[in-house]
């Protein structure tokens, strides 16, 4: 542990160790606190009644009270009050306030804030931004509200919308009204980049990792919401009519084109996830008959059906979380080590449980009977998967291209000609085709196409 120039540390625990030392620096004031291994609290940070998880970084006069920060959080310049900051909650800006909310994998834009007080019965309201949600500059949410996973919040939202069943959406304010664009973030280059960067930014060096983190963008947790979202959008269309210009949902408005695109985006993601699961399940085995395929498809456990939850980084079946809670209530689980061991077991068995869930959804979505599935059914699913993966990658590719458009070059080549502006842009940003992200997308299309073709070839000759 390294403590240097600190103003006050009162009534706290510093859980440092040799593999992941804690650094507490100049001007820091902490009262009633716990700081976990590998964390750095520096430069005038003020903490009151706070828990700081592993490998967090708090600095530049950050101020927090009554809050929990789990692993790999970053807080600089701004303020937090009564928040549950799950892994990778990041706020960098002086004018940003996070208050009375639950967040994880979240990036707060400058000037983002929320209100939990409506000047009636006091500050009693709270809200949730599910994993991967982010806010733009000067965004505002009046709690209570719930923002769906991997959604983007832009503008001021005061109507208490719950969009948890419409993940990967944009929430945009126009003339004091929340407009919802469902599923559009699935094709965003930013979403894919986020998913790639989080594992790389895991700074934990402590061999005893306290948080179990699942980085999967598509999981039973998000796909179950897409199934619900697809049903919601189809029902809105049925009730209000296909020709309606605007649909109303949860005090938000959805344009006709956005609704139809939302259904399409969710179906693409469902095809992608279920196809991924089936390819993974059948990989590396030479099947001789349809019966062999059916036997391989059968799940290894019954655990995994039903609802799934995000436990601040850990994605698990709700049935397993309920089983743990029952154990705590009846006294059979009475040690923190036992609770942690349960979480570890859920995390380790994620793919086993995931397949149980996916197997049931494959039957439901594709209308298949488990006793009658044939190689031809699998080929049909894999072809739909291939179309979904390539289609989504092409959308991401087109989204990335916008970053290399003429309008993106504005601001380069300070006072030169149009050609100098273009040259300056290319010197700094490179050209589109050689961009590392773009080449990765093209390789992904190639690899996934080959993967699908390999399975089709492997089982294509099975007739019986």
Language-model features: where?
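Structured, charged N-terminal subsegments at the starts of enzyme catalytic cores
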Residues: 1-4, 8-9
């Amino acid at each position: 542990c390294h403590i240097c120039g600190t103003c006050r540390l009162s009534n706290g625990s510093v859980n440092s160790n040799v593999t992941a030392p804690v650094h507490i620096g100049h001007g820091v004031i902490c009262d009633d606190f716990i700081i976990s291994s590998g964390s750095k609290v520096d430069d005038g940070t003020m903490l009151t009644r706070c828990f700081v998880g592993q490998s967090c970084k708090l600095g530049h006069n950050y101020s927090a009270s009554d809050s929990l920060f789990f692993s790999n959080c970053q807080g600089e310049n701004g303020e937090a009050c009564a928040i549950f900051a799950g892994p990778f909650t990041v706020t960098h800006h002086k004018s940003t306030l996070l208050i009375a909310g639950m967040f994880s994998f979240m990036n707060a834009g400058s000037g983002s804030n929320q209100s939990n007080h409506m000047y009636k019965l006091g500050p009693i309201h709270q809200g949730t931004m599910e994993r991967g949600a982010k806010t733009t500059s000067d965004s505002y949410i009046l709690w209570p509200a719930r923002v769906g996973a991997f959604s983007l919040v832009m503008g001021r939202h005061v109507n208490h919308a719950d969009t948890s069943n419409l993940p990967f959406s944009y929430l945009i304010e126009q003339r004091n009204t929340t407009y919802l664009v469902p599923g559009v973030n699935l094709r965003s280059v930013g979403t894919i980049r986020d998913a790639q960067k989080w594992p790389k930014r895991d700074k934990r060096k402590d061999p005893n990792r306290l948080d179990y983190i699942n980085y999967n963008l598509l999981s039973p947790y998000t796909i179950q919401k897409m199934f619900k979202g697809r049903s919601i959008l189809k029902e809105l269309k049925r009730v209000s009519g296909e020709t309606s210009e605007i649909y109303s949902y949860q005090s938000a408005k959805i344009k006709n084109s956005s609704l139809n695109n939302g259904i399409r985006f969710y179906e693409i993601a469902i095809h992608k996830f279920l196809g991924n699961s089936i390819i993974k399940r059948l990989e590396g085995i030479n099947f001789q008959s349809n019966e062999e395929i059916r036997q391989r498809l059968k799940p290894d456990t019954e655990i995994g059906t039903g609802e799934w939850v995000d436990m601040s980084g850990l994605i698990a079946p709700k049935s397993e979380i309920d089983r743990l809670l029952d154990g705590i209530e009846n006294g059979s689980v009475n040690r923190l080590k036992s609770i942690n061991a349960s979480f570890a077991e859920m995390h380790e068995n994620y793919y086993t449980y995931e397949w149980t869930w996916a197997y049931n959804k494959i039957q439901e979505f594709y209308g298949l009977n488990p006793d009658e599935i044939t190689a031809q059914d699998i080929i049909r699913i894999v072809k739909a998967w291939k179309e979904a993966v390539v289609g989504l990658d092409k959308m991401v590719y087109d989204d990335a291209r916008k970053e290399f458009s003429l309008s993106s070059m504005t601001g380069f080549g300070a006072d030169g000609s149009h050609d100098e502006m273009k040259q300056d842009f290319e010197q700094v940003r490179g050209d589109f085709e050689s961009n590392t992200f773009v080449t990765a997308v093209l390789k992904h299309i190639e690899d996934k196409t080959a993967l699908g073709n390999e399975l089709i070839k492997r089982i294509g000759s099975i007739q019986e």
